[in-house]
Amino acid sequence: MADRSGDVPVISWRMSREARTTGKLGIDMDILQWMKGHHVFFDGGMGSLLQEKGLGAGELPETWNLLHPQVLVDIHKAYLRAGANIITTNTFGANALKYPSGGQWELEALVRAAVENGKRARKEYAWEERARGACAGEDDIPVFVALDLGPTGKLLKPLGDLDFERAVELYKEVICAGVQAGADLILIETMSDSMEVKAAVLAAKESCGLPVFATMAFDEKGKLLTGGNVESIVALLEGLRVDALGLNCGLGPVQMRSIAQKLLEVSSTQVIVNPNAGLPRSEGGKTVYDIDADRFAQEMETIARMGISMLGGCCGTTPVHIEKLVERCRDLPVERPERKHRTVISSYSQAVVLGKDPVIIGERINPTGKSKFKQALRDHDLEYILRQGVTQQDNGAHVLDVNVGLPEIDEPSMMEEVIRELQSVIDLPLQIDTASPRAMERALRCYNGKALVNSVNGKAEVMEAVFPLVAKYGGVVVGLCLDEDGIPETAEGRIQVAKKIIETAARFKIGPEDIILDGLCMTVSSDSKGALTTLETLRRVRDELHGKTILGVSNISFGLPQREIINAAFFTMALHDGLNAAIIDPNSEAMMRAYYSFRALSDLDARCGDYIGVYGNRQGLSLGATLSGKSGDLGGSKANGPGGTELAGGAGGGMSLSEGVIKGLKEAAQEAVKEALKTGLPLTIINEELIPALDVVGKGFEKGTVFLPQLLMSAEAAKSAFEVIKAHMDCSGQAQEPKGKVILATVKGDIHDIGKNIVKVLLENYGYQVIDLGKDVPPEKVVEAAVKDHVLVVGLSALMTTTVPSMEETIRQLRKEASWVKVMVGGAVLTKEYADTIGADRYCRDAMASVEFAGEVLGG
């Protein structure tokens, strides 16, 4: 068989009427060309079919690539006969964490065998088609072998213990083996962590030139485990320039419909929808799904008619499901996605669109003119920097500028560290503000989302340094309207520089929607016409270039007394003349008054709702009160006054214990608890401050207003406070016994322990002793641990369909040998109904539900 890495088939004999009547289109067409004018049909589930062929509970599916290759070839051919264009290799769980070097199985051999099985299936299928006269040979059928990459099973730092670069390496190992074996494209699927999918995409882009598709595992609310939503993920993946994006697994086609619609609304890239066959349940020890092939195809036709032409299946779907899907959808019109021309940046959890409604960029994380901030950088006082970010978020910023440029520090290292730490406690998008290309790349590589990049200008050497970074990592880049000749004195001169920036960016395939132009705000004290020139530039960018604009507003008043008066007036004028994003101090009462007033007067604030929300109650609401839905705060105080002065004191800064925990600030929580212990009783502090603060964050997590990074950082802050209290109680002879013991384990055959580890952190913070048995745990080991310590609660986790039988067997053995145990279960493949059928006492859809169940059984 010829090497297929660059020679891909082009003609479908069954995909569309056009293909059936026009004949061969040429053998040089690849998947990207094919999908422009044709439906693309993926295959369906693999694990459930392997189980039918004898894959045992806890057995590793990827080993069948070598042990039973004919089984894999037959499954692939069944999907091809059903009409699939893309067959995915049996490599979903293949990585060096699961198959370490020196182990029983060689990772490269498993991956190569998987690709070769797919290629063999394609070749044999082509022979069948040629025998019946449907094609001339293998090069006449549009069949592509996709190298399948699933999650590593680990949370990336700072949420977990897997380093980002290590994740990239793990994926590169698999990709290199798959590419050498002849894969046609890379399919990254079932991703629940935006940072992990970024690692996988970068690994693919840095290892090969194959097309890259990426699909995410959203819940019914359109959220990822780590907090991402549809808009933030689209921003990230389109910034990374994937060739198609979408969703798979976890949900059936009915539940996916609304998420698919949202994808269509915001994506300029082809959308993929690969649902499960409905929701799972257990029958006779086997996993079955509640939607049959006919119903599945009917629902998928509805999705196809929305404008989606890349369709397939995931868990529970079979060749019959795919055949019915192809029959109903192959002759539908193929719709290309419209280019949305949206200027959008994102964090891990939210997207900010720059357009009609002005955006506030907080300017306080910057050492310029701030002696305390400079000292914090020298002292490596990250908590001080985090406090600056938290305060700006509380006071209304939509984006935070991050500048750590100081000659005496290592700016690239500090920038990377500050970006990571800020994103662990704040969910706002960030603006990476640096003149150093090294610092810029370090920041862009570790950034979780699509960043605002500050900046590029019209100088050729600067554009050549910055644009390749934006093209590789994604981002919206600030274009300063200056060049080798300096800052033009006229608006016309600045517009000419802006045009040069836009034209040069196009060479790097960076569209005008990913450029935001800075008309340059000069101090009015030295140039009385400077403000008017800037305002004219704003209007011309808006009206002539149809572009987006940004300004560092406070530059206008440099050298003048009562600067806020000038700043606020100019800010309002600039907003009127088309300013889309303003770099200001959101802690400034005058600036925020100007902002909310302008929006209310410009029909940007429906019924003045935001204005009333801010100024109707002059005391406002703290973050904790907002999360809990109560007025008043939790005892904290504003860190900055109305003038936007620097934080007084160190990291603690007078913040209450509750506020420190809620905001995820460890040092602040430690300082607050030390102060509280001077006058309060340890148990009173725990029960009246620490636990209620955790409850506030937990309720926010359940409501979807707090996301996993914030939840875990709050847990870490609470843990640091608990350690101070424990040390105090140990010294005074008041040591407290844990509330009870809980066993946690990821079941045999499953290496994905993300959910288990999150549950562990929360249970420990609520005072329970956790016995963590790890991952890939045999049922006998769970039973042994439960009997040994007479543990009352056992928590079991499984991500993969193929490992749910292991969970059921573990529960069966617990019922036999440790009947007193209450079992809670969780994982992406489970539902309440499924948990009931395998004998669990409680299905826990998230970590907080596990805490609640432990409280019911053990008290507390």
Regions found by a protein language model. Name each.
Residues 3, 9-518, 522-860:
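Domain-level signal for soluble alpha/beta catalytic cores
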